[in-house]
Every structure is written in C-alpha cells, then in structure tokens.
Amino acid sequence: MVDFPGYNLSGAVASFLFILLTMKQSEDFRVIGPAHPILAGVGEDALLTCQLLPKRTTMHVEVRWYRSEPSTPVFVHRDGVEVTEMQMEEYRGWVEWIENGIAKGNVALKIHNIQPSDNGQYWCHFQDGNYCGETSLLLKVAGLGSAPSIHMEGPGESGVQLVCTARGWFPEPQVYWEDIRGEKLLAVSEHRIQDKDGLFYAEATLVVRNASAESVSCLVHNPVLTEEKGSVISLPEKLQTELASLKVNGPSQPILVRVGEDIQLTCYLSPKANAQSMEVRWDRSHRYPAVHVYMDGDHVAGEQMAEYRGRTVLVSDAIDEGRLTLQILSARPSDDGQYRCLFEKDDVYQEASLDLKVVSLGSSPLITVEGQEDGEMQPMCSSDGWFPQPHVPWRDMEGKTIPSSSQALTQGSHGLFHVQTLLRVTNISAVDVTCSISIPFLGEEKIATFSLSESRMTFLWKTLLVWGLLLAVAVGLPRKRS
C-alpha cells in the first residue's frame, strides 16, 4: 500500500465507504413542484406547493421556502414547528403553513394578500440529515388596474392632443390606440412609472390631425392575464365643450426665485371663466405624479409627488375668474425647470407652460496659496453654495481672462455647487488677479482679489527665514560641540 506524507490511504478508503453506506441516494429522495407557473391576482392569496418523493411524512424533515438566499427564508418548518428567527420581514404574519398532506410528503405555503413584490421565483428546500433536495416554483402576480381615461387638449395648430392614463396595473401594461376601424395609431410618447405599492401608472399621448369625424379608442392590455380594458372618446362631441374654446395663460418670462424663498406659479383662463368645478393640475412633464392637484374644491394628496408634500399652498381667491396661484414653499435646486398648469373639465383640458429658474448666490470666494510647483505659487479660489453651475474665470486687472490649471465643480446632497479653481501662474506678469464667480443670466457676481507681488514677497521672506534658521543651526552646532 502506498502512503502519502501526512495522509493514510487506508483511512481515506474507510471514510469513503462509510459515506457511501450512510448517504441517502438522490434517486430515493426527490423534490418536485408544479409544472407550470402559479398565477395569483393582486390582493388574492397564493398557494405554493411541492412534494417529496417517494411519498413519506415530512413531520421531522426541515422544509424551507426562500426567494434567493436560503439564509433569509420566506418560511421555515422544522420538527413540526415554525422557525421565525431568520424570516424575511415582509413575510412575517403574511404566510401560513398548510398541514394537509404532510403525511404523504405534500407541503404547501399560503401567502396572503399578494402584492407585486411577491412576483418571481421561489424555492422549496427539504433537509433530512445529510441529504437535501429542492425545486423551484414561479409565482406570476397580475393585476387589472383602472379602465383608461382619455383627456383631450383643446385644438391646436398641429391637431388635437389626446392623453390616455391608467393606474393600478401589474406587470407593466401595454397601451395602444385604435381608430374607429380598429386600426392601430402610433403614439407620440409613452410614460410608465411604478408607485410605492409596485403598481404601474401608464400614460400614452396621441396627436390626431383630422378631428372633424373621429372616434378614438385607448386600450390597456395585461400581458400575463391576456385581458384588457378600453375607453372611447368622440372628438366632435368633446370639441363642443366649454374648455375647448378657452386658453390657459401663464407668465411670458421665466420666474426667478432664490433658494429658500417661496415660489409663486400663477396661471389663468382667457377669457375669464369660473374654475370652481374644474380640475386644476400643476405637474412637471407628466400628469402623474403631480406637483399639486385641485379637484372638487380640495387638494388631492394621493397624486402628489413626494418631494412636494407639505410644501404647496393653493391661493384661490380669484378662482371664480379662472385665476389660481400655487405657492411652493422654500425653493430648492431640484424645483428648477419646466412646469405645466392644466385646467380640465369633462376630460377636456387646456395647459400653459411655466419656466422656473432657481438660483443661489454662494459665499464670497476665498483665495489661498496651496504651495508651489516648479518654483511658482498655486493660488486656489474656492466658494460654496451656488446654483445653477456658476461661471468661474480668473482675470487680470485689465479684465482679461487668465487660464486656470484646474477647476472642480461638485454638487452636494442639497443640489448646491462647491467650486475650486487653481491659477496657472507661469509667465504671468500681472501684479494683481481676481477670481470672479457668477451666474450669467442673473447678472450678479462675487469677486476676490489676490496680489501676486505681495504673495511673492511673503513667499520670498518665508523662504529666506527658513534658510536663515537652517544656517544658524548649522553654524551653532560645531561651536556647541567645541
């Protein structure tokens, strides 16, 4: 018999034979699950099942249900009791072990009140002593949402714009338009977003060139359930409504506001009309979620974007004349950009665009000397708290721009910019230079002046002082030794 250093071959053979004799063979221990995906509707209960073969009791076998990691299970059943220590938090109190069938190796787990987050793959894992087996199951969650709503914008130069909206769908639905003959119409834009519950909101926009004799349908299709919901709009009928002949106006110039100030977004109907029975909506680029929605005399909080909650106030003193102002409290850099103001009644709306420019003048620039490179100093100009991104040139006393050696603009967590710029001092004959930080469209700037000549003299005197001290030490040491 051949022996390897530190290893006994006869002992290894004995261990191998022991394992063969004690290990359960895979052909005698199998786990099977459903042959097809399990379909469950949002809000319903789902039953996940699997079976141990050959059929035998699973009372003293560990059964573990998990999603992706066995260490964080959906449910664990061991020695006849539920084990909850490592259970995923989102399944606590929402899963139920079904006892029926465990004597024959059948196990089942019921998940109550199915949500979109439950969609996907699950694993059923058996552990009995030294052997384990598992199988996977696919749970398909589906939900039919609301029937689509079709909103029509009053006629414009390019035709009539239709916006189809639907919410509460899962998975992501398909939205398409059809004419009166059932032929597909091409949407000009589509938008989908998942809400906090995982359900989809869908929006599709269509432009109809010939609105004189058209009925148009919008259909929303669930690809899992192969079911759909639809709505039809008659354009000639809608063109006779009140809002089709009105216009919405807003400020002709951009609205300028500084960070921390309150924003005023005003829009009004022309000619004047009472808007008390209308829906008025301010949004960014899509109808949902919105900045603020007024409907039936009240604010609709459920449609509001999270970043505007608690920050909007509607001024409706002149609502009977069709004039409304939305106040957004304490402007932030993220508020900067385009807004839309929409008046809607009987699914017909008119809109105006508003351009909001949020600005912040930062701190006065500070110039420090960062040392030297190739025998020259490196003046650095820095400042905090700017928005939008500022313009940061160095200039000589004649106003001519001097190229910087580097410039860094970083945006902080609140959206404000911090700027740092280093001056290229090589071959500069200027005595003084300025660091100017400005926001071009605001027409304001902050300036700091730096004297190169004084800094060179200060730098020279510091250098001479250091050399003088070194020389004194060098001369004094030999005398002390003597």
Swiss-Prot record:
Cytoplasmic side: 1-6
GO biological process, one term: T cell receptor signaling pathway
Membrane spanning stretches: 7-23
Compartments where found: Membrane
Ig-like V-type domain segment(s): 29-140, 142-234, 236-355
CDD domains, alphabetized: IgV_MOG_like
Keywords carried by this UniProt record: Disulfide bond, Glycoprotein, Immunoglobulin domain, Membrane, Repeat, Signal-anchor, Transmembrane, Transmembrane helix
Gene Ontology CC annotations of this record: external side of plasma membrane; plasma membrane
Main location: membrane
Intervals, Extracellular compartment: 24-482
Tissue and organ expression note: Expressed in brain, heart, kidney, liver, pancreas, ovary, leukocyte, small intestine, testis and thymus.
SMART domains: IG, IGc1, IGv
Topology with respect to the bilayer: Single-pass type II membrane protein
Superkingdom of the source species: Eukaryota
Pfam families for the chain: C2-set_3, V-set
InterPro entries xref list: BTN3A2-like_Ig-C, Ig-like_dom, Ig-like_dom_sf, Ig-like_fold, Ig_C1-set, Ig_sub, Ig_V-set, IgSF_BTN/MOG
Inducers of expression: By pro-inflammatory cytokines such as TNF and IL1B/interleukin-1 beta.
Disulfide bonds: 50-124, 164-218, 267-341
Family label: Belongs to the immunoglobulin superfamily. BTN/MOG family.
Pathological association: Sarcoidosis 2: An idiopathic, systemic, inflammatory disease characterized by the formation of immune granulomas in involved organs. Granulomas predominantly invade the lungs and the lymphatic system, but also skin, liver, spleen, eyes and other organs may be involved.
UniProt function note: Negative regulator of T-cell proliferation.
Protein name stated in the entry: Butyrophilin-like protein 2
